[in-house]
Amino acid sequence: MAAFKATFFLLLVVCAMVITTTEAGVRVRPCDQVCSRIDREKDECCRAHGYSGHSSCDRGRMTCY
């Protein structure tokens, strides 16, 4: 029973982390134009708009976290 509780708890923690990570990414339209540039410039654009850094660029759409 203790193993079941521990497994359930770990699964719950992992699910919470996935949900939090998914919600953290925000599209920043002004940064779309820097998607083709180096990572440092992408991070700078996201920081200039109040985010910690860039998460990804997908089809020319910048996602910041």
From Swiss-Prot:
Principal subcellular localization: secreted
A GO molecular-function annotation: toxin activity
Tissue expression profile of the protein: Expressed by the venom gland.
Disulfide bond recorded as keyword: yes
Gene3D superfamilies in the cross-refs: Diapause-specific peptide
Signal peptide: 1-24
Keyword Ubl conjugation: no
Disulfide bonds: 31-46, 35-57, 45-64
A Gene Ontology cellular-component term: extracellular region
InterPro entries, sorted: Diapausin_sf (IPR038203)
Keyword line: Disulfide bond, Knottin, Neurotoxin, Secreted, Signal, Toxin
Compartment list: Secreted
Functional summary from the UniProt entry: May act as a neurotoxin.
Similarity comment text for this entry: Belongs to the asilidin-1 family.
Comment field on protein domains: The presence of a 'disulfide through disulfide knot' structurally defines this protein as a knottin.
UniProt name for this protein: U-Asilidin(1)-Mar3a
Species of provenance: Machimus arthriticus (Breck robberfly)
The organism's taxonomic lineage, starting at the top: Eukaryota, Metazoa, Ecdysozoa, Arthropoda, Hexapoda
